[in-house]
């Protein structure tokens, strides 16, 4: 039973694209897009996965 999938990071030097394509993290937080969730994981050293596409 898979809880979620790993967020894929792009190697964007300027940060994430400003595209609103929300994903729901396994931490119960809605992220504006997959890239932003991935960046948060990198900054906080957390293993949050994508629970589902769309807001939580």
Swiss-Prot record:
Its main location: secreted. Serine protease inhibitor which exhibits anti-trypsin activity. In the pancreas, protects against trypsin-catalyzed premature activation of zymogens. In the male reproductive tract, binds to sperm heads where it modulates sperm capacitance by inhibiting calcium uptake and nitrogen oxide (NO) production. Disulfide bonds join 9-38, 16-35, 24-56. It comes from the Eukaryota. It comes from Ovis aries. One of its GO terms (molecular function) is serine-type endopeptidase inhibitor activity. Residues 3-56 form the Kazal-like domain. GO terms for cellular component: extracellular region. The record marks 20-21 as: Necessary for sperm binding. This is Serine protease inhibitor Kazal-type 1. Keywords: Disulfide bond, Protease inhibitor, Secreted, Serine protease inhibitor. Gene3D superfamilies: 3.30.60.30. Signal peptide: none annotated. PANTHER family: SERINE PROTEASE INHIBITOR, SERINE PROTEASE INHIBITOR KAZAL-TYPE 1. The record marks 18-19 as: Reactive bond for trypsin. It is found in: Secreted.
